[in-house]
Amino acid sequence: MNHSTISADIISFTSLGQKDKREIEQKIQYLLEHLAQQYSSIHFYGRIVQGDTIECAMTSPTYALRVALLLKTYIKSIELSEQTEKDNRVKYFKEYGIRAAIAVAPLSVFDDMNGIIDGEAIYMSGRAIKHMSTSNKQKIVVKDTLFFRSKNEEEQEKFESIFSLLDAIISKCSQKQSEVLFYKLSGLNEKEI
């Protein structure tokens, strides 16, 4: 049975000030808890590992893209302190937020109650992110930030095109536009926003 996983890393996280890092971690943790409640029917589980890496898993791939876009738009909508804004690399955080990979494949172990995720899906999404990482590099070059991985090559090719288009559109969104997108993806209408 195919599950869906999302592996993501926060772009330019090491360039952020300590206060901003802690605030972002807290806000992401809050979002992951909210998503666990909202998507409890598909056993959504999300966690932050190594400070700037996010891992999520769910029993159904149906909502994987929505969850990835919720993460991306939510993180892009976070305001940073003025001190952090002065760092040149922070512009990458503001433009892209996170780099995320969705994988649809089996998981050999998925125990959301104990936080255990193991299997092909988490390896595929994790490798996609690790392969595209910009950490420990002198110059940051970010081309794409949304990826799809599947054992089915035909399926992967179809989704990669869609993901590239979504990536280009969302990367152009401002902080406020990202916030509005987040609320729309959360199911709110214009009046509620």
Give the predicted meaning of each segment.
Residues 1-192:
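Regulatory and interdomain segments flanking nucleotide-handling catalytic cores
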